[in-house]
């Protein structure tokens, strides 16, 4: 009975998602992680992104190995070489664990931008059909202009979104 209980508890711990890492670099992939920082699921934001996720076979890798595989892929390397901005967003249920993930992510991501999000934003981003990084941009943009939609945001690159945010921010500052 004890062996069954421990086995069930271990399986529950292994297969329960506790954090997510969103990688936006041309292709947009979201990694769902378990408490051991292993990839449980990889979701692409488009059919092409999902093809990349399937090709890379990231399931059950450590998230740092998965992140390195994503960044080292031909598709992402080409996008970065062509000036695409890298944005990595980390979300989790435990703030300290998120901080640890952020530190590891920053060392892997190098020159890209890294941010953290609340775990509740993972579900909200999925409902909007956006990556976590783009969802955070949507929230920032909507704070300045509530008429902005998730459809508009989904059609933009992270560079375009940052420029849009900058334009809105300077426009708001100029009017105050």
For every predicted segment, state its role.
Residues 1-19:
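Single-pass transmembrane signal-anchor helices and their membrane-water interface zones
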Residues 13-34:
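Ser/Thr/Pro/Gly-rich low-complexity linker/stalk segments immediately outside membranes or between
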Residues 34-87:
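Extracytoplasmic/periplasmic/luminal assembly and interaction segments
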Residues 169-176:
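Extracytoplasmic/luminal low-complexity segments enriched in Pro/Gly and acidic/polar residues
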